[in-house]
């Protein structure tokens, strides 16, 4: 006995609706699967980026700590005999452990040590927590960038032509004045952090360098010794040294503005 055409029509309608529902559910399911896959890909990308960022921060930290730590050990244990000391510069020191304390005190009188130590501390903190972003930390991080770049430039222009490092100092000198400055700037260019520079920050980053200069010249006035020849007010006078410092500040501010400009450009391309 055949089915009534009306029944067949109703059945076909139900089947059609059922198939449409299945197709709709399948489409929705496929969309959910696609979104899950996209989220997974994005998550893996972020995880890999964090890993790569930490690797770069880690290498930067190793370089900075090696340079600073090497100098600290060399000076503590007097591993490199002290050569002839120029008038009004740090030294001479007693040989061996008897002169360890004065050597370490003088060691912390160098801008190179301040900049490398600041890089070592800030980059290690970024390695431990790449998302660290307090305003104070941003200031320290950006200051370390400017100071380490100035360290490399000033050493190359004003000190390297007459410098003659020996023994272990050859390696610590290369690390602190060439390798760490280059790595630090390169890592910043590659992975930031971004959007940390502002016009106000280009002024704030001079707080620590200025504190260093105040300490250096106050101490120098007491002991008649300075870390660098171009700081020697006894030999060259305050006007000449002051002029040099003004030129250094101007050059430093130009570099700070360059960091600001690069930060804005790299933030847009991120």
Residue ranges and their predicted role:
Residues 181-197:
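Alpha-helical transmembrane segments in multipass membrane proteins, preferentially the mid-helix core
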Residues 80-104:
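Perimembrane loop-to-helix junctions flanking transmembrane segments
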Residues 13, 18-20, 29:
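Residue-level detector of structural "landmarks"
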Residues 129-140, 192-200:
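Membrane-interface helix-boundary motifs at transmembrane edges
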Residues 50-55, 223-259:
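Membrane-interface transmembrane-helix boundary segments in multi-pass integral membrane proteins
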Residues 113, 170-182:
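Membrane-interface loop-to-helix entry segments
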Residues 63-84:
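Alpha-helical transmembrane segments of multi-pass membrane proteins
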Residues 156-165:
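Juxtamembrane "helix-exit" motif on the non-cytosolic side of transmembrane helices
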């Amino acid at each position: 006995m055949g089915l009534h055409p009306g029944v067949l029509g109703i059945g076909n309608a139900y089947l059609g609706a059922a198939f449409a529902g299945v197709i709709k559910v399948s489409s929705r399911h496929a969309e959910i699967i696609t979104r899950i896959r996209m989220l997974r890909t994005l998550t893996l990308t972020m995880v890999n980026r964090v890993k790569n960022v930490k690797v770069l921060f880690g290498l930067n930290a190793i370089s900075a700590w090696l340079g600073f730590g090497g100098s600290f050990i060399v000076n503590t244990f007097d591993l490199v005999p002290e050569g002839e000391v120029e008038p009004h510069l740090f030294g001479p020191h007693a040989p061996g452990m008897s002169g360890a304390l004065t050597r370490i005190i003088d060691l912390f009188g160098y801008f190179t040590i301040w900049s490398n130590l600041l890089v070592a501390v800030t980059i290690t903190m970024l390695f431990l927590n790449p998302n660290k972003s307090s305003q104070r930390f941003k200031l320290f991080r950006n200051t370390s960038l400017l100071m380490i770049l100035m360290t490399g430039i000033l050493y190359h222009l004003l000190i390297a032509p007459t410098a003659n490092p020996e023994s272990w100092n050859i390696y610590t000198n290369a690390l602190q004045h060439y390798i760490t400055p280059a790595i630090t700037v390169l890592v910043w260019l590659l992975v930031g952090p971004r959007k940390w520079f502002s016009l106000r920050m280009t002024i704030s980053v001079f707080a620590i360098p200025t504190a260093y200069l105040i300490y250096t010249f106050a101490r120098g006035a007491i002991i008649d010794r300075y870390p660098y020849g171009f700081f020697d007010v006894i030999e060259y006078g305050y006007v000449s040294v002051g002029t040099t410092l003004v030129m250094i500040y101007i050059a430093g501010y130009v570099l700070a503005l360059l960091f600001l400009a690069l930060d804005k450009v790299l933030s847009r391309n991120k």
